[in-house]
Each structure stands twice: as C-alpha cells, then as structure tokens.
C-alpha cells in the first residue's frame, strides 16, 4: 500500500481495478480542513490521462510494473510492433495506448515496455530523444525581437516550435514529456 501524500511523478498504483502512473501531483491544505492530493495520472491500460483527487492520507495499492527493453520495428496503423532484443520475440501494443509516444518513435529505437503481471500496458521513452529536422522554413529578416520561434517538422512527422537558427537536416533534442525543443544535439 502507498499513501497518496507520497505521490510524485513515476509512481505506479492500482485504483478501481486500473493501473495508473503519476505524471504530476499537487498537495494542498485549506485552513483547518483535511489535506487534499490532486494527481494528473495516466491510465496504463487505456492510455488516457485524467485528474484524480484524493483526501490526504488515503492508501492505494502499489502496482509493481516490470520494464523490459525492446526495439521499435514499425506501426501498422492499429498496433505498434516491438521486438525483444534478446529473444527476438515480437509484441504488439495498440496505437491508442501510445499515441503521444508515436510522435518520437523512429525505427530501431530502444524503448521500455511496461508489463503488469503478464499484461503489456504501454511503452516508456527516455526523457529526451534526438531527432532530425526534415522541414524548417528560413528565418525572416527583421522577425528577431523577443525570442523568435518557428515551426519545424521532425523525421517522425511531429511539429514543434524551435529557435530561428535551427535548419533542415539538423539533429535536435526534444522532450518526450512536453514535446518541446530542448537543444541542439552534438554532431
């Protein structure tokens, strides 16, 4: 059992028969009332993100999640196909469970699958990934005041805002949690 007061990002727990991972947790106390915990959590079975509220001190069951490295092969539209790098066994995960993560996946990338007992739930990416810029408009002269940004397209099809100096063909570091530009990758 785990106390909701100890919630922090990355903690996995079971509630109402579903498995959740904490993305954010906010603790609040008002006057003489009881403390409350509001947690932004991801349902690992459905892939949906919800806000759950708990009265402080409530206990929930800890979910022991096994993580195993696998290589991303491809997506067939309905499922993503991953291969165990040791046994060469292939597994499928519904695209609906990994829609956000698909923005950062490229062929051959090593990811971790999350398993609860024998049930494969979803995948976990590194906090940051290096991806190549495939489309980047030229910087417009005179449009350089107040931290100018431009929208670029990555090799995975994901679009994000980057500084004006980023050009096509460059490799950049992107946060998989926020989808934001982190910096240039070392060449």
Curated annotation (Swiss-Prot):
It is found in: Cytoplasm. SUPFAM superfamilies: Nucleic acid-binding proteins (SSF50249), Translation proteins SH3-like domain (SSF50104). One of its GO terms (cellular component) is cytoplasm. CDD domains: S1_EF-P_repeat_1. HAMAP family: EF_P. PANTHER family: ELONGATION FACTOR P, ELONGATION FACTOR P (EF-P) FAMILY PROTEIN. This is Elongation factor P. The gene is efp.
């Amino acid at each position: 059992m785990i106390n909701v007061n100890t919630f922090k990002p990355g903690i996995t727990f079971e509630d109402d028969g579903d498995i959740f991972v904490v993305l954010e947790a906010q603790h609040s106390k008002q006057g003489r009332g009881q403390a409350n915990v509001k947690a932004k959590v991801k349902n690992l079975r459905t892939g949906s993100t919800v806000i759950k509220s708990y009265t402080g001190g409530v206990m929930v069951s800890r979910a022991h999640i096994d993580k195993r490295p696998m290589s991303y092969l491809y997506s067939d539209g309905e499922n993503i196909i991953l291969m165990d790098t040791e046994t060469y066994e292939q597994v499928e995960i519904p695209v609906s469970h990994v829609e956000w993560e698909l923005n950062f996946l490229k062929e051959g990338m090593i990811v971790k699958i999350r398993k609860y007992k024998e049930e494969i739930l979803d995948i976990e990416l590194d906090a940051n990934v290096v991806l190549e810029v495939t489309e980047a408009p030229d910087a417009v002269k005179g449009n350089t005041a107040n931290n100018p940004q431009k929208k670029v397209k990555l090799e995975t099809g994901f679009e994000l805002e980057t500084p004006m100096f980023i050009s096509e063909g460059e490799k950049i570091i992107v946060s998989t949690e926020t989808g934001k530009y982190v910096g240039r990758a070392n060449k």
